[in-house]
Amino acid sequence: EISACLVGSEMCIRDRTDTQYIRQLVSEGEHCHQDFKFEISDARKIARSLSAFANTEGGRLLIGVKDNGKIAGVRSDEEIYMIEAAATMYCKPKVELETQTYKVEGKTVLEIRINETVSKPVYALDETNKPWAYIRIKDENILATPVHLKMWQHSKKPEGALVTFTEREQRLLDALKEKEKLSLNQCCKLCRLNHKTTC
């Protein structure tokens, strides 16, 4: 059983079989530090996940695992190279990651570990090469808000900086302190936005 491991931009080969480890991860389900992918067919889409994990607290992708936790296995070795393309070509700056393959019931599962980056934001390039920064909230990759971008920009300054928010942004942040979750309707009402134009 040959497995490939990508550390930074170096590819190494090692053997590893650990059904119990993968089953434990799968039993946790998808959450803020873990996402399942049935397959990798688009490097740009994977770049969004890499951006989200790198901009938040890091995490892992399990490739060859369906959303319901069923292990389907990776279909081809090309998926490892698509991950590398996502990290180096479609993430700016490039994302350092570690990839390990595991054999589970004769099927191959890829584990991709992404560390939180120091130099935020990490952008994912879309089909027109426009950069978009993502963050991870619960089990979803969400576009970073202008507030996030402003905070990251100011955090790069060595002396620190005071970040000011608009009245709408402050109301939204205050509401999020009280409640962990807000619906779109609640956000629109708090910020006095028209629901139709927001969507």
Q: What is the role of each PLM region?
A:
Residues 1-13:
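Single conserved hydrophobic/aromatic residue that forms the stacking wall/gate
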